[in-house]
Curated annotation (Swiss-Prot):
Protein role: Binds 16S rRNA, required for the assembly of 30S particles and may also be responsible for determining the conformation of the 16S rRNA at the A site.
Domain of life assignment: Bacteria
Gene from which the chain derives: rpsN
GO annotations of cellular component type: cytoplasm; small ribosomal subunit
Keywords, comma-separated and alphabetical: Ribonucleoprotein, Ribosomal protein, RNA-binding, rRNA-binding
Protein name, per record: Small ribosomal subunit protein uS14A
Source organism: Listeria monocytogenes serotype 4b (strain F2365)
């Protein structure tokens, strides 16, 4: 489990990215880079790092499922992930 402060920071950053998304898009399209520079630093989507939805873990993130590899394995073994089966060959 990630630190609560890191998870909270990530949520704040996501909110800022969503809040400024349309403004950033229009400023970029119009080439108004000075105004773009004045926006909050955390409003840039490139500063976000994918985190597990369940635990907040930043590493081992599986983009297709939105969770970390550890939680993926646990949920797959329990049969909680539809369409996921253990491989055998």
């Amino acid at each position: 489990m990630a630190k609560k402060s890191k998870v909270a920071k990530h949520e704040r950053q996501q909110a800022l990215v969503e809040q400024y998304a349309e403004l950033r898009r229009t400023l970029k399209a119009e080439g108004r880079y000075d105004e773009l520079r004045k926006l909050p630093r955390d409003s840039s989507p490139s500063r976000l790092h994918n985190r597990c939805e369940l635990t907040g873990r930043p590493h081992g993130y599986m983009r297709k499922f939105g969770i970390s590899r550890i939680r993926f394995r646990e949920l797959a073994h329990q049969g909680q992930l539809p369409g996921v089966t253990k491989a055998s060959w």
